[in-house]
Amino acid sequence: YKLQQPGARQFMLIFASVGALAGVVNTVLSANGNILTFLFGVIDVTIASVVAFDSSIQPGGDPVWGNFALHAFYFLPMQFVGWWQWRKRGADSKAKVRARRLTRGSAALTVGVFLSGTAVAYYVLCWFGSDISDGFHAIILFDALVFVLNVLGQILMSLAYMEQWYVWILVNVFSVFLWSGKAMASADSSYTVVMVIKYSFYLLNSINGLRIWWKLSQKGHRESDLEEKVS
């Protein structure tokens, strides 16, 4: 049945809740360096894609097409890339991944990509939302920020860099604002509230993830130094 029909609203609430639960498991496993995070990630991003699509076609408010494209066409395939990369760095269902850190040059490049990417994404999303009048749109800016940060965060995560957690903290802060705005703008905001709760938990978990991965990256750095000395 069509998602716009009244009877579909309850289904979408349950559907979003299942995705939120999978996302919680996904982020907890990720924070602990467990490769099974990508299994639950597939479930999470698939459901999040449907939720973002449905939210974007709701009457009234600003669409979140960037969020939809991010999940459907980037996050989903990157789950498989991440699984492959983590396996290369020693992760399995029992062993944690060997984490690493960015060099100063790589960190500067990441910041530059973020700033330029956000500007480009904002104007592309404004153009794509043909029903939106000219002018500044805070929701679209948040959508662009979340889009670019998620792209960077997923790359850093797949390559097992500790700095991913700085990115995820920003992602979750902006996501809370994004979905809070959707909840206030939409006539039926039941499942958007679920998304606000979901990203609020993600924010707390990302802070814990930074703590854990800081230690994992120190251990990974020591192991790399030892391997170089042995070789």
Regions found by a protein language model. Give the residues of each.
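Hydrophobic, ordered structural segments
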Residues: 43-99
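Membrane-embedded alpha-helical segments in integral membrane proteins
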Residues: 1-2, 46-55, 117-126
